[in-house]
């Protein structure tokens, strides 16, 4: 055969280069179009991890990993992460399941174990590194976040079986124990066997009985912090016992941010049951002070120069000074006090749609960090991005 019919070396190299470029282009395209979508569960736990005070959060994620033909197509994930409360840094982040449900949360932490409920069931992790001790309780237990809860009377997680029986997992153990019948009966009408998008853990004040909604934020000394309605005052301002404390210029429809406490029907008082429980998750909601014990309050509103967004401002209740301004968010699903004072806010960044993937830690001196959870790098590896505000 003549050499003229043989492919030249440069032709072979050119063909290979084109193939590599095509495959590389496909890979880059899959990474560019695979931004992870993340939903953090608002039910969180607290633990000491590597000598850090930390918050444990459970979240669902879709996308962000390397899909076929280059990867495992591990698109849907339930994950749990530990975040340091002092600086917002990620301490660990592990995959719990390879499917994503509607709801998830860290129910309790005890004796180095974290109890995490998802729509796959109940799992138990080691808090120091996130290693999985128990993946799930077994096939006989419901696959529903709302099929699990904590009963402090018996110091245990209560778990609903497919047959309607209520079992207990004593905190600090992975054992299965019996539940006294009177306690089990109350939980049978509280726990929910089926997962549902309507069964979310809603920490909004819209779940609070309007008649029981506080008129202001009570301080330990008895004074009351309020934000007057527009029809009560033409000026946007923060009041302390009716006297101006701070102006709220540039903030539309400002409101105080309360700690919303959810009580499952099985543990609710007669008065709480009379106020009512949510139809889809069987919890009573009440609003109480947030930050006031440590001399601060949060105010939420819409910045006048950024319509449609939300902004949080932290105020000193003694001086009226603005200690922190948290902007660029599209709302928050929960604001809650951590055990030692800082306020934890789970929020969505502006323009991210339904993603609740920001863990904001607001310290009482105003120092604030925002941790972007569930993000992935170019190679699909999980990472967290921390911003100091």
What positions do the PLM features span?
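Secretory-pathway ectodomains
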Residues: 2-389
């Amino acid at each position: 055969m003549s050499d003229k019919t043989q492919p030249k070396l440069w032709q072979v190299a050119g063909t290979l280069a084109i193939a590599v470029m095509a495959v590389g282009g496909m890979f880059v395209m899959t990474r560019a179009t695979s931004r992870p979508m993340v939903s953090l569960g608002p039910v969180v736990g607290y633990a000491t991890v590597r000598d850090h005070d930390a918050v444990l959060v459970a979240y669902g994620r879709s996308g962000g990993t390397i899909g076929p033909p280059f990867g495992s197509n591990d698109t849907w994930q339930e994950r749990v992460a530990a975040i340091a409360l002092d600086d917002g840094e990620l301490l660990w982040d592990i995959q719990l399941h390879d499917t994503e449900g509607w709801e998830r949360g860290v129910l309790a932490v005890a004796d180095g174990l974290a109890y995490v409920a998802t729509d796959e069931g109940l799992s138990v992790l080691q808090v120091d590194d996130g290693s999985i001790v128990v993946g799930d309780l077994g096939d006989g237990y419901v696959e529903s976040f709302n099929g699990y809860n904590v009963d402090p009377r018996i110091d245990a997680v209560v778990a609903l079986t497919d047959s309607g029986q209520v079992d207990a997992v004593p905190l600090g153990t992975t054992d299965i124990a019996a539940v006294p019948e009177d306690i089990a009966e109350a939980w049978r009408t509280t726990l929910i066997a089926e997962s549902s998008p309507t069964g979310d853990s809603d920490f909004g004040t819209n779940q609070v009985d309007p008649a029981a909604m506080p008129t202001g934020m009570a301080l330990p000394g008895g004074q009351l912090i309020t934000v007057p309605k527009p029809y009560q005052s033409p000026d946007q301002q923060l009041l302390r016992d009716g006297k101006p404390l701070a102006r709220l210029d540039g903030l539309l429809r400002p409101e105080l941010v309360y700690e919303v406490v959810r009580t499952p029907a099985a543990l609710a008082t007669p008065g709480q049951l009379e106020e009512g429980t949510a139809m889809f998750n069987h919890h009573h909601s009440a609003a109480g002070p947030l930050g006031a014990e440590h001399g601060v309050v949060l105010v939420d509103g819409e910045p006048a120069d950024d319509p449609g967004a939300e902004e949080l401002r932290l105020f000193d209740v003694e001086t009226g000074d603005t200690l922190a301004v948290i902007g660029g968010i599209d709302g928050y699903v929960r604001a809650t006090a951590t055990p030692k004072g800082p306020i934890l806010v789970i929020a969505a960044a502006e323009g991210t749609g339904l993603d609740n993937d920001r863990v904001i830690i607001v310290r009482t001196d105003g120092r604030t960090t925002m941790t972007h959870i569930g993000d992935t790098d170019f190679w699909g590896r999980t990472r967290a991005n921390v911003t100091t505000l």
